[in-house]
Every structure is written in structure tokens, then in C-alpha cells.
């Protein structure tokens, strides 16, 4: 279910203020954030934001296509290591 339109999109105030100060100063350095639920705003385009995935910060370069999405969508939290082990090998050998 999406967020109510009367509430507007959520963005961490501290993150947005840091992006705006970097825009005023023409800086382009990575910003570390734990706010995965923040919506990407047009002011963030062109910046690299290091989003925390639970273990480390994943650098995400923000493009125009990402505006309106959440930061957490671009930093996966789970790593898929494949299905099965010995069972999968045995099934393949029997056929």
C-alpha cells in the first residue's frame, strides 16, 4: 500500500539538508545514511549516497529515473547463495 497523498513523500530532514548544502557548495562526495525509507528527491540527482544494507554502506549513484523511489530499493539486504547443496547434486545425477 502506498503512502497517503495528503501526507506527502517522506525524506529524512537531515539527509535533505546535507544534500542541499552540498548543492550550494558544488560538492560531490558520498553521503552515508541509514535512512533507507527516504524518498529520492530531484535535488539528490547526481549525488552518490551510501545506503546502509544492515552490514555495510552500499554506494548508490542517483539518476533521474530513480526520483520518487526509496533509497532502500537500490541497496539489497539479502544475498542469495543458491538453492540446496548435496540434495540438488544427487537429483541431477539420478536423471
From Swiss-Prot:
Where in this protein does the record put region Disordered?
A: 76-95
UniProt keyword terms in alphabetical order: Ribonucleoprotein, Ribosomal protein, RNA-binding, rRNA-binding
InterPro entries, per the entry? Ribosomal_uS19, Ribosomal_uS19_bac-type, Ribosomal_uS19_CS, Ribosomal_uS19_SF
List where Basic residues composition bias occurs: 80-95
Superkingdom: Bacteria
**Biological processes, Gene Ontology terms:** ribosomal small subunit assembly; translation
Q: Which Pfam families match?
A: Ribosomal_S19
Matches recorded under PROSITE patterns: RIBOSOMAL_S19
* GO-annotated cellular components: cytoplasm; small ribosomal subunit
Q: Which SUPFAM superfamilies match?
A: Ribosomal protein S19
Cite the GO molecular-function annotations of the record.
Answer: rRNA binding; structural constituent of ribosome
Record flagged with keyword RNA-binding: yes
Q: Does the keyword Disulfide bond apply?
A: no
Q: Which family does it belong to?
A: Belongs to the universal ribosomal protein uS19 family.
Q: What does this protein do?
A: Protein S19 forms a complex with S13 that binds strongly to the 16S ribosomal RNA.
Q: What is this protein called?
A: Small ribosomal subunit protein uS19
Which organism is the protein's source?
Herpetosiphon aurantiacus (strain ATCC 23779 / DSM 785 / 114-95)
The gene designation is rpsS
Amino acid at each position: 500500500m502506498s503512502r497517503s497523498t495528503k501526507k506527502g513523500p517522506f525524506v529524512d530532514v537531515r539527509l535533505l539538508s546535507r544534500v542541499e548544502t552540498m548543492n550550494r557548495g558544488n560538492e560531490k562526495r558520498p553521503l552515508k545514511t541509514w535512512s533507507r525509507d527516504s524518498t529520492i528527491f530531484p535535488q539528490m540527482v547526481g549525488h552518490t549516497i551510501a545506503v546502509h544494507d544492515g552490514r555495510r554502506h552500499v554506494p548508490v549513484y542517483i539518476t533521474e529515473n530513480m526520483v520518487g523511489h526509496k533509497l532502500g530499493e537500490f541497496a539489497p539486504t539479502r544475498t542469495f547463495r543458491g538453492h540446496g547443496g548435496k540434495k540438488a547434486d544427487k537429483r541431477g545425477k539420478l536423471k
